[in-house]
Every structure is written in structure tokens, then in C-alpha cells.
Amino acid sequence: MNNFVKQVASKSLKPTKKLSPSDEVISLNECIISFNLDNFYYCNDGLFTKPINTPEDVLKSLLIMESFAYEKMIIKGLIKILISRAYINDIYFTPFGWLTGVDDDPETHVVIKIIFNSSLISIKSQVIEYLKPYNVNNLSVLTTEKELSINTFNVPDSIPMSIISFFPFDTDFILVILFFGVYNDSYCGISYISPKERLPYIIEILKPLVSEINMLSDEIGRTSSIRIFNSTSVKKFPTNTLTSICEIVYSFDESSFPTPKTFTPLNASPYIPKKIVSLLDLPSNVEIKAISRGGVDFITHINNKRLNTILVIAKDNFLKNSTFSGTFIKENIIWKGIYTYRIIKSSFPVPTIKSVTNKKKICKKHCFVNSQYTTRTLSHIL
């Protein structure tokens, strides 16, 4: 989490007022939850590499997660339980490694690091109870020897600035970070999460309380920082205690602030839902609209209908040099024994193949080769 905040805030000008800690210190313990998923077969040995973990890397990891719907459901459900009882430090899942930080790879499919100051017995019992229906293996819920002492600070007279991004551990939420000053080498402030649909309200609430709001914008394949507001006349932020910026996040309580009366239209979002697709999986003989941005080609409309989820095109070697920017129509075919597709019409240049019409169309199967019943999974012909 600390690495994520550092990356998200790296290009923003933050307050440098030096703060002095108060006598109160928040003491926290670390707990590591790990387990293997039943009937989960996956290996990326010799291929996987992720040296830095930028916000773009985090968004890519969340995109990869969409290809594992069942596993995502289990992990996301567990995260929702933990968010209400502890603070999430990081998540590990074999296909994408550590979600926000950089660390050694564990031996289990899933690891969740949390820090807490409540009852471990209660947390452990709820984790075990939640995971019981999913038949996970090698479940471990253990505290480490790591103890954290988080300094607290009184709210200074300086004006905070705010950064808004997606919350990496649950994209149903946004992350709101307010920076007030520094202590030693650490920035000090307070962090909140709020349901993503409350973003317009959060922005209006913050406007009279901060010097500026910088929002991380998801632009599919890249991110940018958008300055939403910059004010020279502000009110004192209604909180009494700050901490060093860390894993500690609070739920944003809108009832502590005046209700906004107007809202600024937003043409950007911290997180846009996306999913990877093969062109084989798209419907044949209908118009499809695609956009290319930041080296990523993605689909926004099918048959003149806007999609709720952006479809990122996974290209094969045949189309690796083509840029999907415009509209196209495709159809699935059997070509030289291979189940594939061809683009039959497009507003941009693509290579073409001719359908074999004078030969029996027999498709090579990956298994069940003697069966007269033929279909495909997402990966195989059978």
C-alpha cells in the first residue's frame, strides 16, 4: 500500500510544512493470511516479471484478475470482510504477484497482508468461516513479529492537498488521501475510502477544504493526473488527528460535512472496468467499434451498443502489427483445420485470409478427438 501511495502521489506537489508528533502512538500488529485454491492450476514460471509496480501495473493486475472470475470472487469477498476489521497492506495472487508492492514470492496461491489493532481471534474465525465453502487448502492466519508504531500529529494551520485514486484492494471504492505536511522522511495526513459512485460528492465536499485535488485518471493502458480544483480560500478540515501516510484508511463520513449543492461534471474516472477478450469470442457479422490508446486496443461498442465493461483485445501474431482504431466486422471460420477468424470489413488496415470453401471444414481438436460433438472452451477445441 505504501508503494502504491508513493507512486500515485509522485507527480503532485505536496505540502512540506514540518510537523511534530504528539504523545499518542498507534500500535499495530501484522498478520499474514495465506492459502491455496482448490483445483486451481496455473503456472507462469520463467515468464513472470514485474520490477516496480506502478499504478499502470496495478491496473494491469486488476485486468488480469478478471480472467479468473471464480478466484476473484473468493478473494474479493474476503477483502470486504477484512476491510471492516483491519487495514490491508498488500495482496498476492499467483498470476500477477504482489498487487501494490514488491516482495519475495510466497509458496501459496493467495496471500493477504493486513495490519490490525483488534482481536486476531475474531479476524481468524471470520476468515475460516468465510473460506469454508470454497475448500481452500493450506490455510494459515498467523501474526508476524513485525510491530508497527504509527506517529500521530495534531492538525496544523497549513492547507492540505488531496489525491484521489482507485482503491487497489477493492475497486468498488475510491481512495482519498490528504497531505498536510512532513515528519522526517514521511508525509503526514489522513486517508479515506468511499464508494466509487460517491466520487462527485467527495470532490464537492473537498473543494472548500483543500488547496487542490489531483485525481488519477484511468486512460486504458496508461494513467494521468488531473487537477480538478485549485482554491486560495479554504476552511479548516474537520479532523483532529493525522498520522504518517500508511495503510491506515478510514471510511469517509459525509455526514461530518455540509451537503454539496452543485456538482462538477467529470469526464474521467480513477478506474474503468475492463476485461481481456480474444476476437474469437466476439460475435460474428456485427459492427464492432475499437479505440487504440497507449499501446492498448480496446472495444467500446458492439452492434451499436455501448459496453459497460471495456474489452481489451488480446492480439495473436496474425494481427500483432495492426492498430484497431475504428469499426470492423469479423467472422469465425475453420481455416486449414484451425478454428480462427477473419476481418471481413474494417475502417483501418488489417491482413486478411480467404475462407476455404471447397474443402471439408474439419477442425483439429485438442481432446475428445473421436467425439462427433464439437465446441470450444475459452482456450481449447474439443
Curated annotation (Swiss-Prot):
A Gene Ontology molecular function term of the record: DNA binding
Annotated Pfam families: Pox_I6 (PF04595), Pox_I6_C (PF12562)
Subcellular locations according to the entry: Virion
Induction of the gene: Expressed in the intermediate phase of the viral replicative cycle.
UniProt xrefs under InterPro entries: Poxvirus_F5/I6_dom, Poxvirus_I6_C
Record GO biological process: viral process
Domain of life: Viruses
Keyword tags: DNA-binding, Virion
Electron transport among keywords: no
Function, as annotated: Binds to the hairpin form of the viral telomeric sequence. Might direct genome encapsidation into the virus particle.
Similarity field: Belongs to the orthopoxvirus OPG082 family.
Name of the protein described by the UniProt record: Telomere-binding protein OPG082
Organism: Vaccinia virus (strain Western Reserve)
Organism ancestry: Viruses, Varidnaviria, Bamfordvirae, Nucleocytoviricota, Pokkesviricetes
